[in-house]
């Protein structure tokens, strides 16, 4: 028996502007709750640094003051509090909260005012997050705890690697994680001096970005390593258009970029999902048929166990490929097939999808908005899940679908290509096939994949294999955390 591998102890400072469920606005909030917990369960000492918004301060008990920071540059004085997340396994992960009422105690969201406009002092608000993160990751820290790695997320903590670069003492290795490259934290050139950065940093080989200064570019330029949320997306962002203007820098740093697919929450599990009509597992798939009938009945479709039912839960946008879907709906219905869609987005696409549904009663249903229970029922009740996205950094629904025995049909981009194995004779034979992938972004290619899916659906042994192959995939956060640990250890070895 091989002894379990032992790893060096790792201290990690995880910096984020949001965390589920206290102040989540998007996917980063989910990651910030789940990944530190998974890292902690691998034996790392992880501490989360976050601004002290009202939702954070009001949602946490037993807060203790552990440090104070004097005013400097344009930053007001701030107090550092410690607490622990009050829910689930995440309660094992300590939180450091920056209490600075002048910057953070406001109505509205983390980034915008109650009217949805960006706070005008966001550069200072997130500059302070970065500055304190850098202090805690350096030998200037007032704490006894010193991280080996500082894990930065998106532009809001992008200045941490820059501050560390210009600090001459001992400091942690820095990791910059891109969740959304489109948001770049761009501000006026004057911001450089306001944030206490040297004027020499305002350069193409520094924080300068098309005449302004960019927090994200600062992070990407000065960090020790870059991670994004899938291997394919890591390659795609090195060229236009998916580089969003950063492709030159990213291609120069290609040897320092890694793609790690996000994990998914344990709540997406057909064995114990409370939203389903009937729970089921890989050992007993009979509940899937019951959920299909419940979905058909609830949405006014003809209840038929044999017709292939395609499902989608998404923002209804051009980026998500819904203009392509519109062009093949008639052929899908004529197969014959059924289609259910849940989501909201661009008005034109919403209206056209609703019109198509009215034209195909009993065969197509569209629900505008979001409904958690229905989203889970679609994953369980559909036979095949559609994701024709033009680009998709990671994607989650294609992973949910596989857990529910619902083979996904996807466009081969980003995380979709990394998490779905196209059904071919070879992939069926070696047991890796989990869905259907089309590569050309055309209605014809999409329809071709759809026809392949229908042919496989009608071959019950093949479809059964596809379902089961998907259900055994490991999309856990533990798998993602294990990949992050490899990066951390590599950075530590480079620092020595």
Swiss-Prot record:
Binding, ADP-alpha-D-glucose: 24
Pathway: Glycan biosynthesis; glycogen biosynthesis
Gene3D superfamilies: Glycogen Phosphorylase B
GO molecular function: alpha-1,4-glucan glucosyltransferase (ADP-glucose donor) activity; alpha-1,4-glucan glucosyltransferase (UDP-glucose donor) activity
Keywords: Glycogen biosynthesis, Glycosyltransferase, Transferase
Highest taxon above the source species: Bacteria
InterPro entries in the record: Glyco_trans_1, GS/SS, Starch_synth_cat_dom
Pfam family, one: Glyco_transf_5
GO biological process: glycogen biosynthetic process
EC number(s) per entry: 2.4.1.21
Keyword Metal-binding: no
Reactions catalysed according to its record: [(1->4)-alpha-D-glucosyl](n) + ADP-alpha-D-glucose = [(1->4)-alpha-D-glucosyl](n+1) + ADP + H(+)
NCBIfam families: glgA (TIGR02095), PRK00654.1-2 (NF001899)
Family: Belongs to the glycosyltransferase 1 family. Bacterial/plant glycogen synthase subfamily.
HAMAP family according to UniProt: Glycogen_synth
Role, per record: Synthesizes alpha-1,4-glucan chains using ADP-glucose.
Protein name: Glycogen synthase
Organism: Nitrosospira multiformis (strain ATCC 25196 / NCIMB 11849 / C 71)
Annotated gene: glgA
């Amino acid at each position: 028996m091989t002894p379990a591998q032992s790893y060096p102890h790792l201290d990690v400072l995880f910096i984020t502007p949001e965390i589920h469920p206290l102040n989540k606005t998007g996917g980063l909030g989910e990651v910030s709750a789940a990944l530190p917990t998974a890292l902690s369960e691998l034996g790392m000492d992880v501490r989360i640094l976050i601004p002290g918004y009202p939702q954070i301060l009001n949602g946490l008990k037993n807060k203790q003051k552990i440090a104070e920071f004097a005013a400097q540059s344009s930053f007001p004085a701030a107090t550092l509090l410690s607490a622990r997340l009050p829910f689930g396994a995440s309660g094992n992960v300590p939180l450091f909260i920056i209490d600075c009422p002048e910057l953070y105690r406001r109505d509205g969201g983390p980034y915008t005012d109650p009217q949805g406009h960006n706070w005008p002092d966001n550069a200072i608000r997130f500059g302070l997050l970065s500055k304190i993160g850098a202090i805690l990751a350096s030998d200037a820290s007032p704490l006894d705890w010193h991280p080996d790695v500082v894990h930065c997320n998106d532009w809001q903590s992008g200045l941490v690697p820059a501050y560390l670069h210009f600090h001459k003492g001992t400091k942690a290795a820095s990791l910059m994680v891109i969740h959304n490259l489109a948001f770049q934290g761009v501000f006026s050139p004057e911001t450089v001096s306001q944030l206490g950065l040297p004027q020499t940093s305002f350069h193409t080989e520094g924080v300068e970005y098309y005449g302004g200064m960019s927090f994200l570019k600062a992070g990407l330029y000065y960090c020790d390593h870059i991670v994004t949320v899938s291997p394919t997306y890591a390659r795609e962002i090195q060229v236009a258009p998916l580089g969003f203007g950063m492709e030159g820098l990213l291609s120069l740093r290609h040897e320092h970029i890694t793609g790690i697919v996000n994990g998914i929450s344990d709540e997406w599990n057909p064995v114990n999902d409370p939203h389903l009509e009937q729970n089921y597992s890989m050992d007993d798939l009979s509940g899937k048929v019951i959920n299909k009938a419940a979905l058909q009945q609830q949405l006014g479709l003809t209840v038929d166990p044999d017709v292939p039912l395609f499902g989608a839960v998404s923002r209804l946008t051009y980026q998500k490929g819904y203009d392509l879907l519109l062009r093949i709906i008639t052929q899908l219905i004529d197969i014959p097939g059924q289609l259910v869609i849940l989501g909201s987005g661009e008005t034109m696409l919403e209206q056209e999808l609703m019109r198509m549904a009215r034209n195909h009663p009993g065969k197509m249903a569209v629900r505008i908005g979001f409904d958690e229970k229905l989203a889970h029922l679609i994953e369980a009740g559909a036979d095949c899940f559609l994701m024709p996205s033009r680009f998709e950094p990671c994607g989650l629904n294609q992973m949910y679908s596989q857990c529910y025995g619902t083979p996904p049909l996807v466009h081969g981009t980003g995380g979709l290509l990394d998490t779905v194995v196209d059904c071919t004779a070879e992939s069926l034979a070696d047991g890796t096939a989990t869905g259907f992938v089309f590569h050309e972004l055309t209605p014809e290619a999409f329809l071709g994949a759809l026809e392949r899916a229908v042919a496989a659906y009608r071959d019950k042994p093949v479809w059964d294999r596809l379902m089961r192959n998907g259900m055994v995939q490991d999309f856990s956060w533990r798998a993602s955390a294990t990949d992050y640990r490899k990066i951390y250890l590599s950075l530590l070895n480079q620092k020595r």
